[in-house]
Amino acid sequence: MGKAIFITGTGTEIGKTVATSFLAFAFQKMGLNTKIFKPIQTGLAEDGVSFADQYWYEKVVGLAQSEGLYYMEPAVSPHLAATLTNTTIDPALIVEKIEQWKRQYDIVLVEGAGGLAVPLIEKEQGFYMTNDLIREYNIPIIIVSLAGLGAIHHTVTTVSYAQQQGIRILGLIFNQFNAESIIHVNNIETIKKMLDLPVIATLPSLAKVTKHTMMALAERWLENNEQKQLLQEVLSVAI
């Protein structure tokens, strides 16, 4: 039986899909059969036909082993997209698919839509949120954040919210990291001091994102034994 990790973020457009792609290439390089599953996808790609995240995984970085479950054209929050398209989102079906992939793959990377407080379903008595799905089915998470100005607040508040919800956090990934920026470097150092969580990776901005550049990034990262060991430790405590 494989393991599942939920990839969430401090907000939208912070690079969860990039981080998920990086992890997929890294785990594959480590010899692990890896599946990407983004159960809820909203909004179309620039071609106006494909769904944006699926297009990224399949066409941009060449990760054919990616899959979704609910595809809705409106580029809005899942609960609103479901209302606009008359779609019924079933959390149990999402988990059923995760368990199915765990039986076939070593690692299942589940990419969420937005952050932890994103509503998935609107009910008469309130909202069913992303954090409800994660908590109810006990899926550990990795939190993705941008590395620049605002990273400290966004990361600390997201971690605090996750901990209040009883969600297990495996570590953090920071996107668009510039090692020459005093702000970026200090943000990471400060967050490490404030939070007792491992920083799994600091990913730079890539001039061009392709399968080759993403694979090269993962390979370079794994050349560092400490970084490779950290990924192995993350896997050891995932379920």
Swiss-Prot record:
The keyword Cytoplasm applies. Its cofactor is Mg(2+). It is an enzyme of class 6 (ligase). ATP binds at residues 13-18, 111-114, 175-176, 204-206. Pathway: Cofactor biosynthesis; biotin biosynthesis; biotin from 7,8-diaminononanoate: step 1/2. CDD domains: DTBS. Mg(2+) binds at residues 17, 59, 111. One of its GO terms (biological process) is biotin biosynthetic process. This is ATP-dependent dethiobiotin synthetase BioD.
